Amino acid sequence: MSSSYYVNALFSKYTAGASLFQNAEPTSCSFAPNSQRSGYGAGAGAFASTVPGLYNVNSPLYXSPFASGYGLGADAYGNLPCASYDQNIPGLCSDLAKGACDKADEGALHGAAEANFRIYPWMRSSGPDRKRGRQTYTRYQTLELEKEFHFNRYLTRRRRIEIAHALCLTERQIKIWFQNRRMKWKKEHKDDGPTAAAAPEGAVPSAAATAAADKADEEDDDEEEEDEEE
């Protein structure tokens, strides 16, 4: 072959390219309407119609991209964004439910902590509107109080505080117990004569002497506290 063949072919190629850009309409690059914007098929056809010398639109090599895209049409591609949003909705709902469950778990733990919280006698309300109930003592507390009463029917304030701390009771509870115990002891020894007013056997005289100041105040409340216990 002569070199003129290649020159002529090259010249004809550039000539076709020149005619291509000369015949191209300026509106071919404008945006397509909304009905054609969902895919590139309609836009490609419109552009190809303006440049017939470039390629054949009807050729199977230049088919619409929707025809070769997994058998889906243009409508399927247009619904993809909505499908992605629908898939995110269950995730958002699950996150909200998880937050509610976390709050419920925190409330349950807080309630369990309050249930295990120990309430001491001095933490209870002592106002006039509080309904009083009968105080119950354990066997250990009763035994220690009986031992103390065997030696001293009347307690000093200092000794009362010591017993209250040792037995986890309040001073008022110690005072009421001793008042009721003295009333019981007086009823038991009512018919014994003048010796009933004496101290119990084994009592320490010095302790009775130091409790003389508290005796007058406690005897005034004996009958009232006895009625409360009954």
Swiss-Prot record:
GO terms for biological process: anterior/posterior pattern specification; regulation of transcription by RNA polymerase II. One of its GO terms (cellular component) is nucleus. Gene3D superfamilies: Homeodomain-like. A motif (Antp-type hexapeptide) lies at residues 119-124. It is found in: Nucleus. InterPro entries: Antp_homeobox, HD, HD_metazoa, Homeobox_antennapedia, Homeobox_Antennapedia_CS, Homeobox_CS, Homeodomain-like_sf. GO terms for molecular function: DNA-binding transcription factor activity, RNA polymerase II-specific; RNA polymerase II cis-regulatory region sequence-specific DNA binding. The keyword DNA-binding applies. Residues 216-230 have a biased composition (Acidic residues). Residues 130-189 bind DNA. Sequence-specific transcription factor which is part of a developmental regulatory system that provides cells with specific positional identities on the anterior-posterior axis. Belongs to the Antp homeobox family. This is Homeobox protein Hox-A7. The gene is HOXA7.
